[in-house]
Amino acid sequence: MTIKAIIHKSCRSVQSAPLQMVLVLNVAIYVALKALWLVGGESGIFDRAVNATVIENSFAGMLAHPWSVATYAFVHLDFLHLLVNMLWFACFASVICSVRDRSNVWWLYLTGAVAGALACMAVGGITFGLTRMAGASAAVMCILGAALAYAPRYRIKVALIGDVPLVVVVAVGGLCLFTETGVSMAAHVAGLAAGVIWGLSWRRSQRQVRRVTREAMIRESARKALLDKARTLGYASLSQTERIQLFDMSNGFKKD
């Protein structure tokens, strides 16, 4: 297999299975950092790796490591933090995969990460002093917000309980993810807001598609009625207005 084929296959895997890929990336990076911490000793390699990937609430830090606005969302330094984030990510990402194209999970994850990073720098630099932030919480909140805004009536199957409304699951997940304060809270709110905007934009586009489809069905029904009248009673039975309508509608369908 050529390098080009390997790259193409990898890109297709990333697009077709974003939920699994995000989980694998987060776990792999956590394991890699733990290995650096254990093996690196006092060499400082662990600290350098962390400093290069987490976000600082300062624009100077962002300019030094611009990629950190996205990479910090894949970095967890605590196992419990990783576990909670990935459990809620899997829960809400599965909802998105059920109601929208799977590739949206990637866009939501990265959008939430960037929104959280910007909130961290904007709010944290003013009120909380210099801090660093790592973890997928803002990205998960973005996916949570999008799922709730787009499919509020969705129901999730929970073992031993049955179907649970998404609103209830979101409430529980929100409480778990909103336990932080300060900079982290600002990042979570920013991620949630970004997700809600995504979800509402999806609903708006869906309503537009439904309206266009409904209007097309009405036009088609009227066109068929005029054609039936012309076949049954003859073209001469159509009024001048009906002939113009039939001509316009027929030309419209040909253009479509």
Which residue ranges define each predicted feature?
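A detector for small-residue-rich transmembrane helices and their helix-helix packing motifs
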Residues: 1-227, 233
